[in-house]
A protein has these predicted regions:
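Anionic N-terminal interaction surfaces
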Residues: 1-32, 73, 89-93, 97, ...
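Short, surface-exposed beta-strand/loop "edge" segments at domain boundaries and coil↔beta transitions
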Residues: 2, 40, 47-48, 75-83
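Canonical pleckstrin homology
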Residues: 28, 60-85
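Structural motif
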Residues: 30, 37-39
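Phosphoinositide-dependent membrane-docking surfaces
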Residues: 38, 48-62
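Residue-level recognition of conserved beta-strand positions in structured domain cores
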Residues: 42, 51, 70-72
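A short, sequence-level motif marking secondary-structure junctions
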Residues: 52-56, 82-90
Length: 103
């Protein structure tokens, strides 16, 4: 199980992602965050969110895995975005350490 990579001010974890109706399984997505931005890279294509564009980060449970739903205000991205990972507790702890609110 992959632990989130940490440096002085970032958290990063590999996983899978759902973007609207599209689904990419592990290991084809990576979520990286610092104190100001959240970046979800899916199959090499980045989705970048500023703190202001993130409306809510919420932990959720799927059939098999757990994930982080990203509610956002960016009209260029699909409305439904979920990052699936194996260690949601470590991810949410890292995000909270950086000042992100996760419900």
């Amino acid at each position: 199980m992959e632990k989130p990579a940490r440096d002085l001010g970032t958290v990063s974890m590999r996983g899978g992602a759902r973007l609207g109706q599209f689904n990419a399984t592990w290991p084809f997505a990576r979520l990286t965050a610092d104190t100001k931005t959240l970046r979800l890279s899916v199959l090499g294509a980045p989705l970048n969110f500023t703190r202001e564009s993130v409306l809510e980060l919420s932990a959720m449970r799927g059939y098999i895995s757990r994930g982080l739903q990203i509610r956002h205000a960016d009209k260029a991205y699909p409305e439904r975005i979920i990052f699936w990972c194996f260690d949601l507790d470590a991810l949410t702890a890292g995000l909270r350490r950086l000042g992100w609110m996760v419900s």
